[in-house]
Amino acid sequence: MSGSRPTQSSEGSRRSRHSARIIAQTTVDAKLHADFEESGSSFDYSTSVRVTGPVVENQPPRSDKVTTTYLHHIQKGKLIQPFGCLLALDEKTFKVIAYSENASELLTMASHAVPSVGEHPVLGIGTDIRSLFTAPSASALQKALGFGDVSLLNPILVHCRTSAKPFYAIIHRVTGSIIIDFEPVKPYEVPMTAAGALQSYKLAAKAITRLQSLPSGSMERLCDTMVQEVFELTGYDRVMAYKFHEDDHGEVVSEVTKPGLEPYLGLHYPATDIPQAARFLFMKNKVRMIVDCNAKHARVLQDEKLSFDLTLCGSTLRAPHSCHLQYMANMDSIASLVMAVVVNEEDGEGDAPDATTQPQKRKRLWGLVVCHNTTPRFVPFPLRYACEFLAQVFAIHVNKEVELDNQMVEKNILRTQTLLCDMLMRDAPLGIVSQSPNIMDLVKCDGAALLYKDKIWKLGTTPSEFHLQEIASWLCEYHMDSTGLSTDSLHDAGFPRALSLGDSVCGMAAVRISSKDMIFWFRSHTAGEVRWGGAKHDPDDRDDARRMHPRSSFKAFLEVVKTRSLPWKDYEMDAIHSLQLILRNAFKDSETTDVNTKVIYSKLNDLKIDGIQELEAVTSEMVRLIETATVPILAVDSDGLVNGWNTKIAELTGLSVDEAIGKHFLTLVEDSSVEIVKRMLENALEGTEEQNVQFEIKTHLSRADAGPISLVVNACASRDLHENVVGVCFVAHDLTGQKTVMDKFTRIEGDYKAIIQNPNPLIPPIFGTDEFGWCTEWNPAMSKLTGLKREEVIDKMLLGEVFGTQKSCCRLKNQEAFVNLGIVLNNAVTSQDPEKVSFAFFTRGGKYVECLLCVSKKLDREGVVTGVFCFLQLASHELQQALHVQRLAERTAVKRLKALAYIKRQIRNPLSGIMFTRKMIEGTELGPEQRRILQTSALCQKQLSKILDDSDLESIIEGCLDLEMKEFTLNEVLTASTSQVMMKSNGKSVRITNETGEEVMSDTLYGDSIRLQQVLADFMLMAVNFTPSGGQLTVSASLRKDQLGRSVHLANLEIRLTHTGAGIPEFLLNQMFGTEEDVSEEGLSLMVSRKLVKLMNGDVQYLRQAGKSSFIITAELAAANK
């Protein structure tokens, strides 16, 4: 299908389009910034935004002086906000290499209340920072500056030597230097005496608990809760949650304000209102505060001898730019606090962790939590740090909601497939418009129409019959060879009468079911979906559209999207395309329909029989696994009567299966656990499945003297075929041994060292921290598990140094795991009950450990919290053995990869020699034919180099490969591809002919020519291999250009490789299409080539005819404009 955007695209091409859009948007941002700086007070916001227009995704990025100057201005600004001061130090000598002009006044001025002794220190270039502060403060700074990740210790409380005034020192590293922001501790503020994340987390404990307790399934509820908690935590006049949409425009999705302020809920604003450069900085600095937009900024003076410009991007004091200050002033906002919400990209990640190279998920800026105040407002760094952590917790929940949305998309696809099958049973095609459900139920739309045998059937909001006929004629004239069109703007797609359709019809998806018959789906303009909850203005109160103001932004956004609808999703186009194929191939006449219907019912019945047999086999296997499992598993029916009791639970309790079956479960648990189990049963029977619930179960007969068994259980609702809950299954962990150890901790009243240092193998791995987050305990079992001795971790920050995502003793899998560990530790300090969660980390030796973490607070004799204890419960021996086998397989794969890397490296050396020799030859006098041959050789060398760079075959297969776009001609590609099979074809006397027209061969295209060359060479070689001696291979190509908008042309390329003989074996073609698990080398080569073609929004077909067969390769490229 053709369209204003590709209807089917891989993850790699989606990322490429997104990257190109960001680059293009940055250019637009730069121009707006330059216009603002040049125009001053005469800057016309609305006109400027309208002139820039929407960013075109397929437009090649450009780099110009305006953009470069803009980015340098953003990154290398030399101004800070005056509420604090800044020093930059040489990393080796701790001497000042830059300082803000207000630093001397804040850090060295004597206080009248504090008598000064000795000379006052002088602040300037070359000053040793330690001379400015008291001895304990200087010592603390020196210790922190020698720390690996200095940000872990922020903030550091220091006192000035002359005035004894307290400051928070906030440190970060940049290339070649250390930047320290000094923020004064306000008189009303209780100074934070201990550094580290755990201290700041306490400030947000209530808000975190509230977020954690929210049920999933509502992004709106999550955002509303977040802004309410931030509103209460920070005290700002207005708190908003911004969400960035796919096209980078923003929307206020939640808001809380103090009475009397105009609400901005529902506001949409153009992408330019928050420039891409600012978004990049938000990804780096996740919290940004502006204290007073009217304050005069302080300059930063740097040593003139420095060979580089200092960047203040990481500084908490960095001054906002004038354009943003003007925007705030127009909103009557004096102060702001912004928190970035950074989430994972929506791509897959392998479940099996790698000990050496664990790939991190790509991150993206989902949105912002923005606080505004009508008066100057300062938030101390500890509270800002707590807000940052709260934003990270919020981001984790946003991730989960996005994943749930993706699951809903999958359900929609399944629903669509059901609808398609339902339509398949009808009298096509009229049944798809005359019955229910109909084609409007297939995808979200405002209207749909069927043009069939020169008659029109309409549903919902559609153009008139006259306009529908005009659209059909336009498609036949301008998109004659395409099977359909999808666009979010008929105006931009080039339909002449698009504006006459009005706002009700902007976007369209259309497909052909025959040469004259079509189906249409229509969407109204985006603004129709937008509702701003802002206050209505008085008719006489008119906004100045030239000012940057929310209402102006909203109007500018509506101006940009006034001819656009919501874009068509890929899965929606898949559903439309599926319906198109069904109608084109399955319903040629009513007789065929009847036959097909009978065949379908027959197939469905066969599937039911197969499904029952398969279900019986699966059920038998599941029963066997449950019976032999090494963990306790039990089940009850809807009345609470036991109907499942495996060998392990019988062994632990001393109650046999026969004795347990039929008993009410509540009679088998300890009295103290009855209410817990009763609540869990009720919730599970209502469909709410709880996890990590701890209770005690009675023991019987020979086990009775051992006392009750302590279990931590996950509940799973059992459902029948109609999804009704008919029982509950419990999968448990036995925590009896661990509970015994913890009870001993309580009984010995703090004298726990005998247990901590006891090498008894029955004692689980234990570690602990003090109340400030420094590691204070690390028992022998923990040392054995991690490979880290006690002295290596004691007195290190548990969060960041011991467990972290970067340079830590025990590396965690990702940032989400790090945040969750912080939540658990924080909750353990503030709550009554111990926390139990799943936990995983990499040991020093690279082993990935998965376990259950139990955290409980440590109390002194007076009941004061002095830290936390953490216990690990490891997986069973059988599970560890299975993981060990998996790791062995992974190591074998790594060895093979190393061998492959060695071969690739050895190939590169002679390849470099060949390329050098070619360049030497290019410098000599050559004729036209010699130069053509040399160019073909160069293209082949580039192809080989590109293949050697392909380190991850799985990424190619999954479609996660970025294409390298550039201009080329088909003549270059076909010549280089053909040259690679000439040796083989000459050896078999196979003649290769090219029947492509000269115009197509010489047309300039835009795409990844080397990948296209690689694909064609592979298919040509396969064709030659299966062509008999003396046979022929014919190459032909056609090119169709579709106009997308006013300046972009889409080039639909089709190449046919026709060869004589019986053709490619069927099993190889199955391997190419991925329908067989065992793939040969030839099959893998075909499959990879097809995946590369699909990255170009194309595909490969194989057509068999009498005495000959053809590869038909299609690809979507851009037609380069000269």
From Swiss-Prot:
Every PAS domain range: 618-688, 748-822
Tissue: Expressed in fruits, flowers, leaves, stems, seedlings and roots.
Family that this chain belongs to: Belongs to the phytochrome family.
Principal place of residence: cytoplasm
Protein induction: Induced by cold.
Database matches in InterPro entries: GAF, GAF-like_dom_sf, HATPase_C_sf, His_kinase_dom, HisK_dim/P_dom, PAS, PAS-like_dom_sf, PAS_2
The protein's name: Phytochrome A
Taxonomy of the source species: Eukaryota, Viridiplantae, Streptophyta, Embryophyta, Tracheophyta
GAF domain ranges (all copies): 218-402
Gene field: PHYA
UniProt record, GO biological process: detection of visible light; gravitropism; negative regulation of translation; photomorphogenesis; phototropism; red light signaling pathway; regulation of DNA-templated transcription; response to arsenic-containing substance
Disulfide bonds: none
One GO CC annotation: nucleus
Claim: Transcription regulation is one of the keywords in the record: yes
Domain Histidine kinase: 902-1119
TM region positions: none
Keywords, sorted A to Z: Chromophore, Cytoplasm, Kinase, Nucleus, Phosphoprotein, Photoreceptor protein, Receptor, Repeat, Sensory transduction, Transcription, Transcription regulation, Transferase
Assembly with partners or alone: Homodimer. Interacts with NDPK2 and PKS4. Stabilized by interactions with PAPP5 and FYPP3 which are enhanced in the phosphorylated Pfr form. Interacts with COP1/SPA1 complex. Binds, via its photosensory domain, to PTAC12/HMR when photoactivated; this interaction stimulates its localization to photobodies. Interacts with FHY1, FHL and FHY3, especially upon far-red (FR) light illumination; when underphosphorylated. Forms PHYA/FHY1/HFR1 complex. Binds to PIF3/PAP3.
Keyword Methyltransferase tagged: no
Function, as annotated: Regulatory photoreceptor which exists in two forms that are reversibly interconvertible by light: the Pr form that absorbs maximally in the red region of the spectrum and the Pfr form that absorbs maximally in the far-red region. Photoconversion of Pr to Pfr induces an array of morphogenetic responses, whereas reconversion of Pfr to Pr cancels the induction of those responses. Pfr controls the expression of a number of nuclear genes including those encoding the small subunit of ribulose-bisphosphate carboxylase, chlorophyll A/B binding protein, protochlorophyllide reductase, rRNA, etc.
Gene Ontology molecular function, alphabetical: far-red light photoreceptor activity; identical protein binding; mRNA binding; phosphorelay sensor kinase activity; protein homodimerization activity; protein kinase activity; red or far-red light photoreceptor activity
Residue span of region Disordered: 1-21
Residue span, PAC domain: 695-747
